[in-house]
Amino acid sequence: MPRDGEPDMPQGAHDFAMWDAAYVLGALSDADRLEFEAHLVGCISCREAVTELTAVSPLLSLLDYDQVIAPDASDESVAVPPCPDLLTSLLAKAEQRSAVASDPVELRPALMTATTVDAQTVFPVFRTGNYAPVHDELTAFDLPVEGSIPAELNGWYLRNGPNPRTGAGHWCVGDGMVHGLRLENGRAAWYRNRWVRTESFEHPIPPYNDDGSRNLHSSIANTHVVRHAGKTLALMEFSLPYEISNDLETLGAYDFGGKLADSMTAHPKICPTTGEMHFFGSGNIFEPHVSYHRADADGRLTISRPIDVPALTLMHDFALTADHVVFMDLPLLFDPGVAITQQFDRDLPYRWDDQHQARLGVLRRDDPYGRLRWFDIDPCFVFHIANAYDVTSASGDSIVLEVLRYPEMWRDSSEFGDDAALWRWKINLDTGVVEESQLDDRGVEFPRVDDRLAGSAARYSVAVGSGALVRYDLQRDTATEHRFGADGSHRAPSAPGEAVFAPAVGQSDELAGWYLTYVYDPVTDGSDLVVIDASDFEGDPVARIRLPRRVPHGFHGNWIPD
């Protein structure tokens, strides 16, 4: 960016072009640092350079000292191409280092920088149709409705998801945007969409500090939105949660009054009996890679303890029952070779590892600092658990988990291959054996149960299938569908998202209430909020709320009643 009165110059040719490394290394004087920071506000190329160079210190932690120094030219086994800049050289050497490491998972991994690539050529599907982002925020009041909104639905329906602000980068790591509706007295009072304005929203913050520790304020907050102890939290699993208001404005990072020095999973579990919120943090370079936390019904953090896992695995979800907490240690591991040679937003830095034993870790809720028991299972990966519950019978005590299971995940790249299907795991606490059985062969994702029955034997679970919602009767092991096809049998559009159950006031029956979901119509390129009567799941929706804009595909959300 030229100074006032100066002609345009080629990128990198201005007066500040050589200041980036000195700034990152802390070598600028106070006056020069302030001048350079003022310049960064308006100069994209310098901001990108600083973001790139910030990765150098964590990268060095991956390498032996002799790997950083230029190799002996006589050593033909060291194939490091001539590189004009330090970072490229370090990347090349680090790639070689990870390739020859005898035990790559013992390396200290460092996530790459926020430098982006052209996702149109790498992940074209994530920029077309309903994966395309929307580019502004709006508010609309008194939305048109087809049908009738049940008068007792008074509250907010909120859903979070990635909404990239540029044409670059993987869709999954786009900035979080919450789409919300306020329902009251049979009206759709308002619709709002708002970005979650984290501290790294305007000025990207590297996810790791120079010493390899995590920067918990570096967040895109794009995965889930939950309410607990009077606070609404936007979540992304490698950072602190961010609190938002009832009007969806960002209030700031939330660390439980300074007590939480860890990230928070995007899938916390709120016990319907005690009101406690259970969650874990993951993503630490150093051990412990995972820690378990518990907050009481008033939002006070009461328990924090490490969970012993041997490597930095991708742990996205976990399970809570009346008596137990269950963690999944599955063979999808952080791969430093991918992390230091690929942009994080181009290729997610996790790879399948055949040598890592898949297992489930069980912790008693009444002994939160006690020993975990580990149970081996067949290799697989699970993003989402539908539900879990305890069983006591003549054959012994057990824990049942109903999960959406992939046979494997990301062996060679972070492209999605096989679909997930519904499976049941039964952990026999007496014999130590896990019984694994497939319940259905349909490809489904984003399962939900009635949240009031989380941790107990809920009868119904609803998941997203191909052009349909699939409801499983988990007592009878049967399924029915609410289809959104083009055959005219239903007038709703064709692509539903996660369905959230909103119970009827004063009713405990799982069929007394409604499923809420955003549904995308590819013909009109628009979206509706669809309300389905749980007692007439296959029938027409009772209401379709016409939204003023398309709601892109996203992840998770919740119904928050008054």
Please state what every model-predicted region is.
Residues 37, 54, 358-361:
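Class I S-adenosyl-L-methionine
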Residues 54, 98, 182-185:
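Short amphipathic alpha-helical segments enriched in hydrophobics
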Residues 111-562:
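Beta-propeller domains
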Residues 48-52:
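Detector for the c-type heme attachment site
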Residues 16, 40-43, 53, 417-419, ...:
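Surface-exposed flexible segments
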Residues 1-47, 59-62:
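Short, amphipathic alpha-helical interaction patch
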Residues 1-15, 57-110:
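Positively biased amphipathic helices and basic secretion/translocation or surface-docking motifs
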